[in-house]
Amino acid sequence: MESLSALYKNHIVTLQERTRDVLARFQMDALLIHSGELVNVFLDDHPYPFKVNPQFKAWVPVTQVPNCWLLVDGVNKPKLWFYLPVDYWHNVEPLPTAFWTEEVDVIALPKADGIGSQLPAARGNIGYIGPVPERALGLGIAADKINPKGVIDYLHYYRAYKTDYELACMREAQKSAVNGHRAAYEAFQSGMSEFDINQAYLTATGHRDTDVPYSNIVALNEHASVLHYTKLDHRAPAEMRSFLLDAGAEYNGYAADLTRTWAAHGDNDFAHLIKDVNDEQLALISTMKAGTRYVDYHIQFHQRIAKLLRKHQLVTDMSEEAMVENDLTGPFMPHGIGHPLGLQVHDVAGFMQDDTGTHLAAPSKYPYLRCTRIIEPRMVLTIEPGIYFIESLLAPWREGPFSKHFNWQKIDAMKPFGGIRIEDNVVVHENSIENMTRDLKLA
């Protein structure tokens, strides 16, 4: 495989091409991209954890340093002003010398407010991309050039197509996340609490809890029925029944997002249901190919859920087609089949049909689906079906004409296990699908 530096060099060529195109389209001279600033907690002198502007880390793998600036015009070498204060109160990141610094002019910026003296004097035709509009106004950027929608739509649309450098980074993020999942499973088997399982995960991935790309979901037993459960109980339950782990990792600013579900005992109905969800997830991935609308795979999985509900006698005396048509599968899988993945976990432009930002909403029947694009080579997506036992969603079905088809006794017996989700991260290629997660032998 090519070195990361060689891949990065080509990555910058691609970003420069996109920049030239978008600047020509909107008749602008350059883009000034801001890493962001620290924001203090209200009435306190303590800042929230810093999260970098994703459009900034698309160019450089600098994810922990506020007050940095990039100036790009698609022609000249990108300029990075790297915040390098004299400060004995806080750690200061050294001026970077890494695989990527040959492709960027790196300039020390000793004072956060010193950027104004470094920029070109004529700024009326420079666009600002960043989280602090007032800072841009103070630099003389025109109000209509601050986060201009057309520019951002264009940049977001093409972020769906990963460069080889980006794919290499995402494969590295997978490795960390897989290590974390294995450590967390061992912690679960040894009877640890959610809090301690999470600590084992972070240790194995080398992340702090502020470094992971999203808050880890570490859910034992019925907690797995809360889709984004992040509480982390300090005490292990008296009886271990199930464990759902939805946790990722980051490498050079690129995310992994994996989910696995395990049963404490391998011979009960819930364990058999996990195996079947896993098998259907893999079967769905085997049908994927470039040129198909992502929505089709979501709809297809509802048909697969109907098959499982029937096989496990959770819904009875109804055809699989009728289950889907009448949305009896809906309360069991209330979220989408997945989403784009990249610099952000729920990566941008999932609904964008072209580089002008044309929006195609999710079907009204499945409003929580996060992607309606036709999948194409170089896209990275999650495939994360699930079956859950969520009382607030099941309750309306306990009354009415369809209630008789639900095997309430069996459903209620499943509720203490919470639910199941299996999530892999896949890359679309011209004639194949690469499953980055399974390639690392995460069962």
From Swiss-Prot:
Mn(2+) 1 binds at D257, H339, E384, E423. Mn(2+) 2 binds at D246, D257, E423. Belongs to the peptidase M24B family. Bacterial-type prolidase subfamily. This is Xaa-Pro dipeptidase. SUPFAM superfamilies: Creatinase/aminopeptidase. Its cofactor is Mn(2+). The gene is pepQ. Its EC number is 3.4.13.9. Binds 2 manganese ions per subunit. One of its GO terms (cellular component) is cytosol. Splits dipeptides with a prolyl residue in the C-terminal position. It holds the Pfam family PepQ_N. Keywords: Dipeptidase, Hydrolase, Manganese, Metal-binding, Metalloprotease, Protease. GO terms for molecular function: aminopeptidase activity; metal ion binding; metalloexopeptidase activity; phosphoric triester hydrolase activity; proline dipeptidase activity. It comes from Klebsiella pneumoniae (strain 342). GO terms for biological process: proteolysis. It comes from the Bacteria.
